[in-house]
Regions:
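Glycan-recognition and catalytic cores of secretory/periplasmic carbohydrate-active enzymes
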Residues: 1-309
Length: 309
């Protein structure tokens, strides 16, 4: 019973997503990692129970994050003190952006897909998987970031271990989810959500994706659902623009055996933030496909770092 519950600041109420019942929550608040994992649970419960109020709450929270609380590298959580969400469009470039929050957001996205079957969920998840997640691990695989600010002054380094070592196991957790994220099956529909070289089996149905081709062998009559990423241009299936699109997926009646060619352009895109994001007035970012570019330069005097695009 959340009514008249006494507060214990600063670790209850909104901070702990404990300010009201889950079905009455409509925006992302409080500790970012705890929040996205709690919201993942909400979405999973809604998908299982088909509770309309819980479904609506999870959808509103997802939209709140995706539209106004998500940094361009696919991570969330602004404040360093309490590792929490900020207000809408409060997206400073020195934000905290904890690795665990990025992983948790991807997990929330996976649950939202179960709930909605909407391809747009994967635009957010794919951004996270291609940017904040790989950037949080060194090339050697033994140093990690706890936080991932978009802008530093050359004083930010990965650590070999941490007093709060929550990030490495969260990274392992998201890797374990990848098979369920790349492919999904619902009745006779098989969805290819992430264009990652892979093979999968659903009973007697075997599929693979490699070099832009989906190969299918099945005893069932299969309908392929090929996600059309938001960043993709000139998306084609077997050399043609898709004729049928459902919830962001190109629909292909593949039958029992098929080889389907998927083509799309990945142009270099210049992106500007929403005008409400004060921190990014007069700034741009560059992405190719789902990958965010990093601009860096070694300088003696940071005040002299000035360039124009």
């Amino acid at each position: 019973n959340h009514k008249d519950r006494h507060t214990f600041p600063p670790f209850l109420r909104e901070y702990a997503q404990d300010h009201c019942a889950a079905r009455d929550q409509h925006e992302a608040v409080g500790h970012a990692v705890r929040a996205v994992l709690f919201y993942e649970g909400m979405a999973e419960a809604a998908a299982s129970s088909r509770d309309e109020e819980l479904t609506h709450a999870a959808y509103l929270i997802w939209r709140d994050i995706a539209e106004s609380k998500l940094h361009i590298n696919g991570c969330v959580g602004v404040a360093p003190g309490d590792e929490s969400f900020g207000q809408q469009y409060d997206l400073p470039n020195n934000a905290y952006l904890e690795t665990c929050a990025g992983v948790g957001l991807a997990l929330f996205g996976g649950a939202m897909f179960k709930l909605t079957s909407d391809a747009s969920v994967w635009d957010v998840v794919e951004n996270t998987l291609n940017n904040v997640v790989p950037a949080s691990v060194s090339a050697s695989g033994d140093h990690y970031t706890y936080q991932n600010p978009l802008e530093t002054r050359g004083d930010f380094e990965r650590w070999s271990w941490h007093g709060c070592p929550c990030c490495p196991p969260m990274l392992l957790k998201i890797v374990g989810e990848m098979p369920r994220y790349i492919w999904a099956k619902k009745n006779r529909d098989i969805m290819l959500n992430l264009y990652i070289e892979s093979e999968v089996s659903f009973g007697s149905t075997k599929l693979s994706y490699k070099n832009g081709k989906v190969t299918l062998e099945s005893d069932e009559n299969v309908r392929l659902m090929l996600r059309i990423p938001a960043w993709a241009r000139n998306f084609k299936v077997n050399g043609k623009a898709p004729e049928v699109i459902v919830k962001g997926y190109a629909v292909v009646e593949a039958g029992h055996r098929a080889v389907v060619t998927v083509e799309m352009d990945k142009p270099l895109m210049k992106l500007m933030a929403h005008p409400y994001v004060d921190a990014d007035h007069g700034r741009v970012a560059f992405m190719r496909g789902p990958v965010l570019y990093c601009c860096e330069k070694k300088v003696e005097n940071w005040e002299e770092l000035d360039f124009t695009l």
